[in-house]
A protein has these predicted regions:
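Glycine-enriched alpha-helix->loop->beta-strand junction motifs that scaffold or abut catalytic
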Residues: 44-48, 72-73, 96-101, 173-175, ...
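Hydrophobic faces of well-ordered beta-strands that scaffold small-molecule active sites
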Residues: 24-28, 50-52, 75-79, 105, ...
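Phosphate- and divalent-cation-binding pockets in alpha/beta enzyme and binding domains
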Residues: 35, 60, 112-116, 186-187
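N-terminal amphipathic/basic-hydrophobic helices that include classical n-h-c signal peptides
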Residues: 1-15
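Conserved anion-binding
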Residues: 21, 87-91, 98-172, 183, ...
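N-terminal glycine-rich anion-binding loop in soluble enzyme alpha/beta folds
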Residues: 17-42, 46, 122
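Generic structural signal for hydrophobic
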Residues: 42-43, 68, 94-95, 169, ...
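Metabolite-binding pocket within alpha/beta catalytic cores that recognizes anionic/polar moieties
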Residues: 51-102, 106
Length: 209
């Protein structure tokens, strides 16, 4: 069972506790909502947080988020918005009404895009009397390797850019970032405690799948 780990203080959470832990987010990498229904039933109360990405949202988004919320689950809507500031911000405002607990954008969209998104989302939540979802930024996609990085013409290292983008996201008011476990320590040192770090592709200790 692969998913993402969330850290707000230490580097990585302890995954030994079998009770539901909001620091473990299970990825719903499906096209069909029937697969979601089956997995949520199988995992029951042991998991409280699920990640819905493009694959599932584009095929069943209108059904899957309400289904999860109706089962008292938290939702990380992983759509990685990246557009001009107004478009990204308005897209996030529309997604807020889905009931997601975490939304995200690409940090490479820049400070203005992230700041506009934060301000617009908080203003709308206050106006509507709704809880504001956490807003986090993707630093560098974990699939990017050194060859890909060089092809982009980047002069700094991947780690240096991850830290730079994390600090930019924090300065824009973002709640945290998505980054690989390899960069978690450097981000924590640069951004301090209380800044959310979501690390994808982790498995809890003792997981059989």
């Amino acid at each position: 069972m692969a998913g993402a780990a969330v850290s707000n203080g230490g580097l990585l959470p302890n995954m030994e506790d079998k009770m539901a832990d909001d620091r473990l987010i299970v990825a719903l990498d499906f096209h069909d909502i029937d697969d979601v229904v089956a997995l949520v039933a199988e995992l029951g109360d042991s998991v409280s947080f699920y990640k819905v990405g493009m694959e599932l949202f584009y095929s069943a988004g209108a059904e899957v988020v309400p289904f999860l919320k109706n089962h008292n689950k938290k939702v990380f809507l992983d759509l990685k918005l990246h557009d001009i500031p107004n478009t990204a911000a308005e897209g996030l405002c529309s997604l807020m009404f889905q009931g997601a607990d975490i939304l995200n954008v690409h940090a490479s969209g820049g400070y203005t895009m992230m700041k506009t998104a934060v301000d617009r989302l908080h203003a709308l939540a206050e106006k509507k009397g709704m809880p504001c979802p956490k807003l986090i930024a993707v630093t560098i996609l974990t699939s990017i390797n050194e060859e890909d990085w060089a092809g982009l013409g980047m002069q700094c290292t991947i780690r240096e850019q991850v830290v730079r983008l994390a600090k930019l996201a924090k300065s824009a008011g973002m709640d945290g970032v998505v980054a690989s476990p390899q960069e978690a320590a450097a981000i924590r040192e640069a951004c301090g405690p209380g800044f959310m770090i979501v690390t994808p592709g982790v498995r809890p200790a003792g997981a059989s799948v």
